[in-house]
Amino acid sequence: MSVDKAELCGSLLTWLQTFQVSPPCASPQDLSSGLAIAHVLNQIDPSWFNNEWLQGISEDSSPSWRLKVRKLEKILQSLVEYSKNVLGHPVSDQHLPDVSLIGEFSNPAELGKLLQLVLGCAISCEKKQEYIQRIMTLEESVQHVVMEAIQELMTKDTPDSLSPENYGNFDTQSRRYYFLSEEVEEGDHLQQHYLDLERQLLLLSEEKQNLAQENAALRERVGRSEVESAPGLTAKKLLLLQSQLEQLQEENFRLESSREDDRLRCLELEREVAELQQRNQALTSLSQEAQALKDEMDELRQSSERARQLEATLNSCRRRLGELQELRRQVRQLEERNAGHAERTRQLEEELRRAGSLRAQLEAQRRQVQELQGQWQEEAMKAEKWLFECRNLEEKCDLVTKEKERLLTERDSLREANEELRCAQLQPRGLAQADLSLDPTPSGLENLAAEILPAELRETLVRLQLENKRLCQQEAADRERQEELQRHLEEANRARHGLEAQQRLNQQQLSELRAQVEELQKALQEQGGKTEDPTLLKRKLEDHLQKLHEADLELQRKREYIEELEPPTDSSTARRIEELQDSLQKKDADLRAMEERYRRYVDKARTVIQTLEPKQRPPTVVSPEFHTLRSQLWERNLRIRQMEMDYEKSRRRQEQEEKLLISAWYSMGMALEHRAGEEHAPAHAQSFLAQQRLATNARRGPLGRQALSLRPTDKH
């Protein structure tokens, strides 16, 4: 059956106006831009023809026919994809319109093909019942054209599904309703159509009665008018009424014949509905039985497969169980060995902890001894200093006593000389008193005494005065020289006493260090400790010094690198740099202190090494018991390391076996699930009814065309 595309375009335009979209759709020119068709498709399925797709169609409203053609191509592509992916109806090439003719010339024939595809999408979507009801509200001629277009589209899409062998010899109306519904709803639609026909018959019978009543009333009026009115007017009215009566009779006859035809058709449809219901019930029962048998077969097949897999799994589990028991026995043995080793380790740790506590006490006592030695050295230095001061004071006291005796003797001699001079002066004093009245002036008396004294005595007196002055000067010089010599002597004595005290302290410290080394050796021998070789101690100290030197060099390099990278900074940055420099200086001071401490340690180690040299001690200091303890400790450490390695290997092997078991169970479960999914997968749809069922029951995701574009395409 072929439908005129121009007539089809007009009817589909009438059907398209039932969607009430905003763009005009009254003429082919209105539809050439594609906007109205896009809005209609958006109403048909908003999830596929979504707002983004609609916005892409409505972006440019330019009158250019090339833009129209591009939009129509996009609409046609979306229609083909929707029919193929969602509805399961691939569009044949003969139904594809030429969009260039539509966009440029508004060709009604090509536009009819495009609207026919839109109609196919409308009657196959989820809201198809609503759109079919809209079609039923149109005029009869429009309904007829639309139904023929649907039949043509469905017939050319699935030619084998419309054969008389499958569906019987239905009339046009029943076949149209068949293509608009599914097999499950076919009987309901036929029954509904039968009820509609009955309602139409009732309406026609009522209309017939009304017409009969009206005919009787008209006849009465005609009879009265013949009596009352003039003959000419009556004849005209009579002719008019006769013609109307004939028309009504013909209409009545036609309605009666159509009623009889409808009644016969209704009876035939009732029989067909009953037959179809019986066939449907039989087929439904058979399909249910077949499905039940198929499900039972699938379950039995799955159960047998699962039983085989479980048997294989059981055998492997039994084998693994034997291996696991062997491993448990080995683990139990290892645990017992580990328990013994742990107990031995605990005892050794206890001994080591006691040795550590004794070593800590020894270190504390050694520090106390060192502090007391330092205090004793300070007190000894103070005592030597005070002793030296006391000796100096005693010598000074002796010198002062001798000087006092010398001064006393000199005083006595001067006192005698004074007495002699006083006696010599008493002789002329009498003469001076006798002649006082003659010359009362004292200057005259003195001159007179000087003249009376003998010349020898006067010369002796002058000589004694000069000698006295010279002796006083010589005594002052001798006293200064004596004081200087005494000062040098005191300094030399002080240095000598200091050196003697330092020598005594060094000798005492050396003896104390030797005693400490001997005590340390005895303590290590008693505790079973491990005495390090002097060369090993020296090597360790050298390593520490080397590490300290390397750290100092690294710090110096970092400081130089920081100075090279230092940019011009503000006050806050300068303050930060100063803080960093202070911290670096502190670290340098700490490093220097550490280096000084290591140097002291090196000095002490050297003294210890010197004390431990064969020249100063007998060669048999290390006893055989000490060697025995050292070898036992080494063997014990070796056994502990071996046990730790065995335990780590067993733990790793157990973890690997557990991971292998878990992965095997997981792989087996995934394989069973995959096989069950393949067995329960539905057979490929080969008929139109199966395609309709799959299309109706398809569940599309929220993403619409983006989600469905990822689904595999159906093969027909």
Curated annotation (Swiss-Prot):
<dbReference type="GO" id="GO:0007040">
    <property type="term" value="P:lysosome organization"/>
</dbReference>
<comment type="similarity">
    <text>Belongs to the hook family.</text>
</comment>
<comment type="function">
    <text>Component of the FTS/Hook/FHIP complex (FHF complex). The FHF complex may function to promote vesicle trafficking and/or fusion via the homotypic vesicular protein sorting complex (the HOPS complex). Contributes to the establishment and maintenance of centrosome function. May function in the positioning or formation of aggresomes, which are pericentriolar accumulations of misfolded proteins, proteasomes and chaperones. FHF complex promotes the distribution of AP-4 complex to the perinuclear area of the cell.</text>
</comment>
<keyword id="KW-0813">Transport</keyword>
<keyword id="KW-0206">Cytoskeleton</keyword>
<dbReference type="GO" id="GO:0045022">
    <property type="term" value="P:early endosome to late endosome transport"/>
</dbReference>
<dbReference type="GO" id="GO:0031122">
    <property type="term" value="P:cytoplasmic microtubule organization"/>
</dbReference>
<feature type="coiled-coil region">
    <location>
        <begin position="455"/>
        <end position="605"/>
    </location>
</feature>
<feature type="region of interest" description="Required for localization to the centrosome and induction of aggresome formation">
    <location>
        <begin position="533"/>
        <end position="716"/>
    </location>
</feature>
<dbReference type="Pfam" id="PF19047">
    <property type="entry name" value="HOOK_N"/>
</dbReference>
<feature type="region of interest" description="Required for localization to the centrosome and induction of aggresome formation">
    <location>
        <begin position="1"/>
        <end position="161"/>
    </location>
</feature>
<protein>
    <recommendedName>
        <fullName>Protein Hook homolog 2</fullName>
    </recommendedName>
</protein>
<feature type="modified residue" description="Phosphoserine">
    <location>
        <position position="163"/>
    </location>
</feature>
<dbReference type="InterPro" id="IPR008636">
    <property type="entry name" value="Hook_C"/>
</dbReference>
<dbReference type="GO" id="GO:0070695">
    <property type="term" value="C:FHF complex"/>
</dbReference>
<dbReference type="GO" id="GO:0005829">
    <property type="term" value="C:cytosol"/>
</dbReference>
<dbReference type="GO" id="GO:0005813">
    <property type="term" value="C:centrosome"/>
</dbReference>
<dbReference type="GO" id="GO:0007032">
    <property type="term" value="P:endosome organization"/>
</dbReference>
<keyword id="KW-0493">Microtubule</keyword>
<feature type="coiled-coil region">
    <location>
        <begin position="188"/>
        <end position="427"/>
    </location>
</feature>
<dbReference type="GO" id="GO:0015031">
    <property type="term" value="P:protein transport"/>
</dbReference>
<dbReference type="InterPro" id="IPR001715">
    <property type="entry name" value="CH_dom"/>
</dbReference>
<dbReference type="InterPro" id="IPR043936">
    <property type="entry name" value="HOOK_N"/>
</dbReference>
<feature type="region of interest" description="Sufficient for interaction with CNTRL">
    <location>
        <begin position="582"/>
        <end position="716"/>
    </location>
</feature>
<keyword id="KW-0175">Coiled coil</keyword>
<keyword id="KW-0653">Protein transport</keyword>
<dbReference type="GO" id="GO:0030897">
    <property type="term" value="C:HOPS complex"/>
</dbReference>
<feature type="region of interest" description="Sufficient for interaction with microtubules">
    <location>
        <begin position="1"/>
        <end position="546"/>
    </location>
</feature>
<dbReference type="InterPro" id="IPR036872">
    <property type="entry name" value="CH_dom_sf"/>
</dbReference>
<dbReference type="GO" id="GO:0005874">
    <property type="term" value="C:microtubule"/>
</dbReference>
<dbReference type="GO" id="GO:0008017">
    <property type="term" value="F:microtubule binding"/>
</dbReference>
<feature type="domain" description="Calponin-homology (CH)">
    <location>
        <begin position="6"/>
        <end position="122"/>
    </location>
</feature>
<keyword id="KW-0597">Phosphoprotein</keyword>
<dbReference type="GO" id="GO:0042802">
    <property type="term" value="F:identical protein binding"/>
</dbReference>
<keyword id="KW-0333">Golgi apparatus</keyword>
<dbReference type="Pfam" id="PF05622">
    <property type="entry name" value="HOOK"/>
</dbReference>
<dbReference type="GO" id="GO:0005802">
    <property type="term" value="C:trans-Golgi network"/>
</dbReference>
<dbReference type="GO" id="GO:1905719">
    <property type="term" value="P:protein localization to perinuclear region of cytoplasm"/>
</dbReference>
<comment type="subunit">
    <text>Self-associates. Component of the FTS/Hook/FHIP complex (FHF complex), composed of AKTIP/FTS, FHIP1B, and one or more members of the Hook family of proteins HOOK1, HOOK2, and HOOK3. May interact directly with AKTIP/FTS, HOOK1 and HOOK3. Associates with several subunits of the homotypic vesicular sorting complex (the HOPS complex) including VPS16 and VPS41; these interactions may be indirect. Interacts with CNTRL. Interacts with microtubules. Interacts with ZC3H14. Interacts with LRGUK (via guanylate kinase-like domain). Interacts with CCDC181.</text>
</comment>
<dbReference type="GO" id="GO:0008333">
    <property type="term" value="P:endosome to lysosome transport"/>
</dbReference>
<keyword id="KW-0963">Cytoplasm</keyword>
<dbReference type="GO" id="GO:0030705">
    <property type="term" value="P:cytoskeleton-dependent intracellular transport"/>
</dbReference>
